[in-house]
Amino acid sequence: MGSQLFDNAPYLAALEVVLGLVREVRRRFGHTVAELNLGGGFGVTYTDEARPPYAYFLDPLMARLEAFCQDEGMTRPAVVIEPGRSIVAEAGLSLYTVGSIKDIRGVRKYVSVDGGMTDNIRPSLYGAVYRGLLANRAEEASTDTATICGKCCESGDILIRDARIPPARPGDLLAVFSTGAYGFSMASNYNSSPIPAVVLVKEGRSELIVRRQSYADLLATAVIPESLQCARDAH
């Protein structure tokens, strides 16, 4: 269907196409479809998007399907959806430590963090937009405008452009919201960066579910050819 959809019209239009195929298959071949996958793509909140409830998408779809099955005299197929991102995106956030700060007068202020495109490539890859705050100073007024940049040697390693935050200081904790989807799953070891840990948090309890990679992990699959070992031993 697509991604980040906030309107149910495309789903209803697609369902009509699918129901036409269900009808044709039944009449031409005598086969009744037992399962329909209605897809996913339900929108989530990254910044200020108003996220519709699942019922907004599914209630009209199910009503149309029920009416179709009644008209056709057939049992309603099992319905499958793919909620994916809409379940996990807002359930996750990324925590970074602020490092160096560079204020280019009249241009912009850069606040660097100890992560970036290696753990969340979406802003660099296709301009995804996120919201963040200084977690250790969340009650302070956001009087500063800064561009949050990563640690990679890439000018495009930007997490958030023109973020409104309190004046950042080295050591501050930056929280970036709605990174539960396509963050860890798209992480890489670019620039020989270890992938960070994943921690499950619920009701004041925290449990490690993916440990932080070490540099030893990055080298674990490296193999030194025998010819190079001989050259090394000779010296």
Can you describe what each PLM-predicted range is?
Residues P60, M74-H235:
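Charged (often Lys/Glu-rich) extended helix/loop segments that serve as interaction or gating elements
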Residues M1-K102, I165, N191-S193, K202:
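Active-site loop/helix belt of alpha/beta enzymes
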